[in-house]
């Protein structure tokens, strides 16, 4: 399973989603705003119609969403999110 997290510095929700992944022992690649990607590149990935927020989590190139959506995904796929 390939997990990519699009984040930015000083983002509390980004920290929270990475802490959850670490607790669940899920490996992920992190892409940091203005280092690894631009806002325009992220907008292309998430779609023009969606608010541009971080974190954005992708699993196997499929957009899951932000922290809440990822936590729900974990629950629905047997990972729990304790």
At which residue positions do the language-model features occur?
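Structural micro-motif
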Residues: 47-58, 67-68
């Amino acid at each position: 399973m390939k997990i990519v997290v699009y984040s930015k510095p000083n983002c509390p929700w980004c920290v929270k989603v990475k802490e959850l992944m670490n607790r669940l022992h899920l490996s992920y690649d992190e892409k940091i705003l203005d280092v690894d990607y631009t806002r325009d590149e992220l907008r292309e990935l998430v779609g023009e119609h969606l608010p541009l927020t971080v974190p954005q989590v992708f699993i196997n190139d499929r957009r899951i969403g932000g922290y809440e959506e990822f936590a729900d995904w974990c629950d629905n796929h047997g990972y729990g999110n304790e």
